[in-house]
């Protein structure tokens, strides 16, 4: 029976169909220009860029230029790459230009699609960012598609890990910049820790196209980018508490796998209190007394570490370190650490060295970073299941782009077995049958542990020729994925490992040529070998096609339908045949957590025998329902987190904008004077209550605070004794004395140095207080949830108290800046004052596809100081040119040749 909605769609078409249909007139207009474009010489075609820029200068909008610009970019791609964008790719390009998400199936050429809106938007000269999930793809695409942009006269840059600030500035200044989401986010944070505008590398957030947009804006939305600095060592505390958790019995705690929460029962709490008391760690009578907040935090983390986190599923131990496993991709994420002390609890559990906790210096979520862009768009193979989230959070509409050729892949119903053992028997049998007839098989698993269990089983069953693609073997990832389409190939992969590399039937000719002929010089012999490889790949492709194309065999359902769809989507690219099937058991995580008991009873009643499967569309529907529930819950979590993060994000934007204004400002004397007046108002109001008699004034307190904040010794006692003296008189006299002292200091320093000193003091003080404020907000957020028990809305409470904390921070800023500037002295005026140094920083910087930290050594490494602080060898320093000195140690001989230590010569600035 057709639903009313289905009937309406048949008559009127869906909103998606209408959006696609609305682009057709422009597609036809672009096609109508094709012969005209082909008739142009290379010089004439490239010259159109300058003409378009002139049109924009004369008032034309980018929409006005869409048809001719797309026609130009299409012809350039045909000439330079030998690739002509199809009509459906033009539609995808228009969706991206309009600030939407284009859902395009695997193999439909998303990389090429992006060139069309990138070219059009780059004409405005404000920069376009193409965002990918790892350095490999950013570099590959910038070189590959960069040929089109360069042919058309545009500059292209790429941001990858390890570049200097100068190289980053050049890349960001390009018309088109390819970069990873992590590099963009960290450059934004680092820019907002700089002390001079010229040191910043980014030039604004105009337009971004995010590749694999679901991975970046949904899967990674909850994981903030964090720059942090080290805190005190608490390893002994973690180890002690870990020994207590081991002593607990199942009745001492309750675990909820579905919600991923754990709590202590009354018996457990009592047992813990006794253990903590014996270890002299408990203050007061109860574990939940206010002075034991930190201890509660530690014991909760230790319980989670032991009961909610499994080794080889959620993390592995490698080289004496806990390495997190990405739940979506099954990849290792070296360098990424759980926050709030959970990682340290896992280290204590596994008896490896406990790394110190870090204090957050700056952080931003991808949700908030990408909302900085004036226009944002994205592409992926799977976005429709998250359409509501993209719409609600980012204001992005998802449009499903039709495929160039119809998808003929056969998606078969799930096979459900009672036990994991029965399921694996069926999987091995299925793999054997597919391999025997020469059908390439991609076997999808949800974790490293399961991929290796299956690999062991295949070995025992006599399989020799198969590949395992999981976090342990990421180095060969692209190569394994590229050859997974060979006839009879068996590839076991965790979830979406290798995303970004197509599985081509017969194998990937380009990668084979690079691999087999890497060192062979150009010439007739190499050309002959290349032709042989291409012919061999074609032959193998025909064989794989005859066997039915790629068979995607999934061993488990993921919590998210989108991840399942991504796995299915590896098969049936560009009209190729293929098939997909999920093999499940009632002992799988999703089935177990979401009510498999009822189904088990039902299957027993139906008389299901051992090794028999149940296959029915109803089962698929029931599973989809369970997945929708999980997705809805995860969306609610992300939405709720965003509401809280928006509070700190609004404050972050205010602070970062203020920093830029301070760096841009020629003179800050007026701002400093206002701060000073604010401090004077506060200390006078505190000492002299409204309508109070002179005898009631706190004269001693006022004198002490004038000395503390203004560095002035004023006869406040004598003033207070004067007949008829009022509060305003006291305030005016203090202000006059403070202004006179500030003016005298400014004249001694000179305007240039004074401006530098003021800017440095304000920026450094603001940064220090902002870091403390971030910690305070984190603490507030961790406790505000309990207000719900008092029938108060935790979010409103958080907003109110966060605002109060922010106001208090600004008050502290006024006081600290005033106190410092009223004391600062010039020991020796440097010829060129060195910029302040940033604090020691650690960056958690994870590649979204490989799940690895891009810092060298695979560890969370000390962030490299900016290039103006780089160490320069003494022999390379010119005594007469300070720009060549780099970073000089304070106790080194001054490079100017005076013979004094640097700190007593050019570095003598306090």
Curated annotation (Swiss-Prot):
GO terms (BP aspect): intracellular protein transmembrane transport; protein import; protein targeting; protein transport by the Sec complex
Cofactor: Zn(2+)
Known catalytic reactions: ATP + H2O + cellular proteinSide 1 = ADP + phosphate + cellular proteinSide 2
Record's GO cellular component terms: cell envelope Sec protein transport complex; cytosol; plasma membrane
PROSITE patterns reported in the protein's UniProt record: SECA, SECA_MOTOR_DEAD
SMART domains per the UniProt record, alphabetical: SecA_DEAD, SecA_PP_bind
Cofactor note: May bind 1 zinc ion per subunit.
Functional summary from the UniProt entry: Part of the Sec protein translocase complex. Interacts with the SecYEG preprotein conducting channel. Has a central role in coupling the hydrolysis of ATP to the transfer of proteins into and across the cell membrane, serving both as a receptor for the preprotein-SecB complex and as an ATP-driven molecular motor driving the stepwise translocation of polypeptide chains across the membrane.
Protein name: Protein translocase subunit SecA
